[in-house]
Amino acid sequence: MPIFGQDDFDTEVLLEGCQLAGLQVIEYTPRRADANSVIPTLRGRFPEAVIVAGSTIDDENVIRQMQQKFPQLMSIAQLAPFVDGFVSMLPYSDATLQAYSPTHLCIPTAQTGGEALRQVGKGAAFIKVLGPDFSFSKNLHATPTFGYCPTYITGGVTRERMPEAFAAGNVLCAAGFDVVLKGENPETITPERVAALLCAFVESAKAARAAVNPQLSRLEELTDEEFLAVLPNYCSVI
């Protein structure tokens, strides 16, 4: 999953590249200054894709104050009509998970096992873990946890590190365009080049995940019942 964060690349070039690549999911964050104008348009541009808002904060008082400095910030309530899910580098409260998990994918961060268990139990679809170190992922997937926790990892997950990321137990990974397009010139890159590099990332991720969880390599062919049966983790989205 590509993450629209803060970088020097042109938004329109990146969006066109995502369209050419036929991506099934994208994450757009308010770290990008145009987020409050772009996020409401994404469903129209990507009608078949899952649209996720990243870098969310589930405290409206904090959002209101920080909007003075970062006017592109939107609360979860403001984002909800335009997206299919939310990601955060922070935990979510029980109230947020109970309010939004029935209708949206909720992917908060945890930094302890207890924090992860609480949030999954309240409806989190995945727990976000922060790379590039995989120690916490491995702890969450240790034998005594019975592999309950579905984890999504970001941060330094290059194509070369994907096998290690999935071997640590993660079932999803994402990267910002600073990683996906590393070494590319923002002034000259084309949508076609963006699409080619995105497709290479997607194929590397699929291959790395299939090596660890081969039962997940043909998800589009499974019924809902078969899908739930092959998942390696607990599923709160039922």
Predicted segments — roles?
Residues 1-65, 159, 188-206, 225-238:
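Conserved N-terminal beta1-alpha1 strand-loop-helix module at the mouth
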Residues 2-4, 24-33, 50-58, 65-92, ...:
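Catalytic beta/alpha-barrel core
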Residues 11, 35-39, 93-97, 113-117, ...:
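Short, well-ordered alpha-helical microsegments
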Residues 13-20, 36-47, 76-81, 98-101, ...:
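Acidic (Asp/Glu)-rich catalytic clusters
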Residues 19, 39-46, 93-103, 120, ...:
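Surface-exposed amphipathic alpha-helices with a cationic face
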Residues 60-81, 114-123, 139, 157-173, ...:
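Catalytic cores of alpha/beta
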Residues 79-95, 129-138, 169-197:
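Glycine-rich phosphate-binding active-site loops on the catalytic face of alpha/beta enzymes
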Residues 97-105, 146, 166, 181-237:
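C-terminal helical cap(s) of enzyme catalytic domains, especially alpha/beta-barrels
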